[in-house]
Amino acid sequence: TLTAAITMALSTISGKQGKKYDDIDSAPEEKARGITINTAHVEYETETRHYAHVDCPGHADYVKNMITGAAQMDGAILVVSGADGPMPQTKEHLLLAKQVGVPSIVVFLNKEDQVDDEELLELVELEVREMLDNYDFPGDDTPIITGSALLALQALTDTTDAIGRGSNPWVDKILTLMDNVDEYIPTPERETEKPFLMAVEDVFSITGRGTVATGRVERGGIKIGDTVEIVGLKETRSTTVTGLKMFQKMLQESIAGDNVGMLLRGIQKTDIQRGMVIAQPGSITPHVSFEAQVYVLTKEEGGRHTPFLSGYRPQFYVRTTDVTGKVESLKSDEDKSEMKMVVPGDRVTMSVELVQPIAIEKG
């Protein structure tokens, strides 16, 4: 709802087409439960910036999909109900945002229209600030904007006239939210100088043209005609980029931070899948084993309730894929002594054997 309100509010100012709520929750399973399952991408512009906006799920059973969306963010808008206060998944979202490196957050307290008591809204705000502090975000400095996405959206859909600043209080609150996002979330430093890399999010075929892989360019840049390697899960393959497309526009080149579709020469749909990476030749290699320094989250932090031993086989999330791995050895982070068992809260160095090769590099 907020995503739709933002795109429509900004479109009335810029004169561009906004996205209606029904257009954002587009997959059939999303409609069935009235919730956002897969991350949906929209774009919009403020006076100073162009945004690619990922609408992340707010439901605990879709955390896996949120990971694939959150791993791409330069900043986030955390939506909390002003009427109900933070939910259990609010903590999950903050923990996840911290873990995947979302640098800055702006908070939107939604459903302000359902709160009669001003003090109640202030209490919710205090609770949110405390929660931000608990997850190492600056609670005191984080902008918190109140409003009602639904009432703003109704105001925007009920009229055919352009709604400018000052003509509707609920729409103004959405514009104030985006002013704060513009000011508070720093412009990211793009990794354009590094070797090109894009994690594959999705793959589809275009009849008569070939296979297209989509994803966000993590670093470097790519031009039509460049040679790239497809790395991970299967044998590494070399191919040539024959087309680039972003938000329905054909491009000659693309750089870090862009969400693009990439047409690849001589590649079948079966040759490439989500979880692989497309990279500058020789810049990254596939691995089936690695060593990692790990902090095992406690139950209170949203982690495990029980200890685990060597031989434990968890899922490892890397970029856009999850792959099973076997924990081969465990050593104490302090004195490097061999550990038989790891308890939530421990810091350990673990050696892991993966069931499939994936493109990883030293962190």
Curated annotation (Swiss-Prot):
GTP hydrolase that promotes the GTP-dependent binding of aminoacyl-tRNA to the A-site of ribosomes during protein biosynthesis. Its EC number is 3.6.5.3. Keywords: Chloroplast, Elongation factor, GTP-binding, Hydrolase, Nucleotide-binding, Plastid, Protein biosynthesis. GTP binds at residues 55-59, 110-113. Belongs to the TRAFAC class translation factor GTPase superfamily. Classic translation factor GTPase family. EF-Tu/EF-1A subfamily. Its main location: plastid. It is an enzyme of class 3 (hydrolase). Residues 1-189 form the tr-type G domain. GO terms for molecular function: GTP binding; GTPase activity; translation elongation factor activity. PANTHER family: ELONGATION FACTOR TU, CHLOROPLASTIC, ELONGATION FACTOR TU-RELATED. It is found in: Plastid, Chloroplast. It catalyses: GTP + H2O = GDP + phosphate + H(+). One of its GO terms (biological process) is mitochondrial translational elongation. GO terms for cellular component: chloroplast; mitochondrion. The lineage of its organism: Eukaryota, Sar, Rhizaria, Cercozoa, Chlorarachniophyceae. This is Elongation factor Tu, chloroplastic.
